[in-house]
């Protein structure tokens, strides 16, 4: 069945689909946390970030902002029928563990947690040290 444009905006409404298991990618930097939940094929089901959850500036880097973003993404994924997820965590940010706990607390069963942070084999030169 083709998707029909909605009346008011003219955009295409997202179709509700039943996806029982998927993958949650948590990208946690020092400034923000982005949670993307996809099916096993890689099609994005839902996503949320600390910024899209209403936090601004330095507050986006906090663990509480990561928790709020993860809960928001998980709620939308559960509405699509998701039950089990594998979690891929990337980055050095403060919201890594908090986001995982929030996904579990929202009612998703976590089957695997993997750290996929890219580590260079002495690649690019890092930025200079800050002197404050």
UniProtKB/Swiss-Prot annotation:
Pfam families: Ribosomal_S11 (PF00411)
Record carries keyword Ribosomal protein: yes
Cystine pairs: none
InterPro entries: Ribosomal_uS11, Ribosomal_uS11_bac-type, Ribosomal_uS11_CS, Ribosomal_uS11_sf
GO biological process, one term: translation
Highest taxon in the source lineage: Bacteria
Cellular component GO terms held in the UniProt record: ribonucleoprotein complex; ribosome
UniProt keywords, alphabetically: Ribonucleoprotein, Ribosomal protein, RNA-binding, rRNA-binding
The protein's assembly and partners: Part of the 30S ribosomal subunit. Interacts with proteins S7 and S18. Binds to IF-3.
Protein function: Located on the platform of the 30S subunit, it bridges several disparate RNA helices of the 16S rRNA. Forms part of the Shine-Dalgarno cleft in the 70S ribosome.
Family statement drawn from the similarity comment of this UniProt entry: Belongs to the universal ribosomal protein uS11 family.
UniProt name for this protein: Small ribosomal subunit protein uS11
Organism lineage string: Bacteria, Bacillati, Cyanobacteriota, Cyanophyceae, Gomontiellales
Gene: rpsK
């Amino acid at each position: 069945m083709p998707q029909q444009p909605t009346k008011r905006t003219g955009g295409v409404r997202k179709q509700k689909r039943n996806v029982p298991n998927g993958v949650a990618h948590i990208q946690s930097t020092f400034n923000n946390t982005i949670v993307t939940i996809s099916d096993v094929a890689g099609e994005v089901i839902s996503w949320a970030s600390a910024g899209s959850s209403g936090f601004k500036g330095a507050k986006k880097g906090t663990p509480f902002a990561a928790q709020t973003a993860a809960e928001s993404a998980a709620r939308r994924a559960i509405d699509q029928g998701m039950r089990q997820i594998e979690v891929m965590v990337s980055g050095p940010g403060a919201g890594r563990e908090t986001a995982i706990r929030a996904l579990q607390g929202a009612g998703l069963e976590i089957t695997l947690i993997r750290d996929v942070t890219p580590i260079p084999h002495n690649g690019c030169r890092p930025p200079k040290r800050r002197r404050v």
